């Protein structure tokens, strides 16, 4: 909580900096009580974030709703927007399609469905890379939707060509 307070002080003082909030709520060591407390802290940041980038599980935890299909993704994106986020992209991965990685972007007015072919290899860290790439594009003054599209393509290409750089196949996270 102390770190969250320091971070909040920073974002309140620097409203001219684009903020990409990647709400990592789930890891092997997390417990329900910790997730609930972290959720409450993260919600406080929504009004200051240029965009939030939860995956499906994180979006479900933040909205406290289940996502079973694309329409649910849209409804949860709208709900997260209504909680104060300026823009929302929910990373759907391949939960609903084995062929396509489907993300939903919402800006308060329009939904945009972003798709790319599913690549199963070397995808550890893809979510963090996606959020970092969005931040980089925003610092280059890209509009938010364009930044998201560029980031999705960047991550796709990075995974697609990762074997050329010696990235180990099927990296074991344990």
Question: How should each PLM-predicted stretch be described?
Answer:
Residues 1-44:
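Glycine/small-residue-rich loop that forms an oxyanion/phosphate-binding "nest" at active or ligand-binding sites
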Residues 111-112, 137-151:
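Phosphate-handling active-site elements
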Residues 111-124:
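Short pre-catalytic strand/loop immediately N-terminal to key active-site residues, enriched for Gly-Thr
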Residues 33-111:
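Conserved phosphate/ATP/ADP-binding segment of small-molecule kinases
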Residues 61, 121-144:
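Short, small-residue alpha-helix embedded
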Residues 25-27, 93-96, 118-120, 152-155:
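Glycine-rich beta-alpha junction loops
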Residues 145-174:
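Charged C-terminal helix
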Residues 2-7, 38-42, 72-76, 126, ...:
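General structural feature for long, well-ordered alpha-helical segments within catalytic domains
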């Amino acid at each position: 909580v102390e770190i969250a307070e320091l971070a909040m002080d920073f974002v309140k003082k620097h409203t001219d900096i684009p903020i990409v909030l990647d709400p990592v709520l789930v890891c092997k060591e997390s417990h329900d009580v910790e997730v609930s407390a972290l959720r409450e802290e993260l919600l406080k940041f929504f009004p200051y974030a240029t965009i939030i980038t939860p995956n499906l599980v994180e979006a479900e935890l933040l909205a406290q709703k289940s996502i079973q299909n694309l329409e649910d993704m849209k409804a949860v994106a709208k709900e997260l927007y209504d909680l104060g986020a300026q823009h929302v992209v929910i990373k759907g991965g391949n939960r609903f399609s084995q062929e396509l990685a489907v993300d939903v972007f919402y800006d308060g007015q329009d939904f945009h469905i972003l798709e790319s072919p599913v690549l199963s290899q070397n995808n550890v860290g893809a979510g963090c890379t996606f959020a970092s790439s969005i931040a980089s594009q925003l610092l280059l003054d890209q509009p938010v939707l364009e930044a998201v599209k560029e980031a999705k393509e960047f991550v796709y290409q990075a995974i697609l060509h990762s074997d050329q750089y010696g990235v180990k196949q099927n990296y074991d996270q344990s």
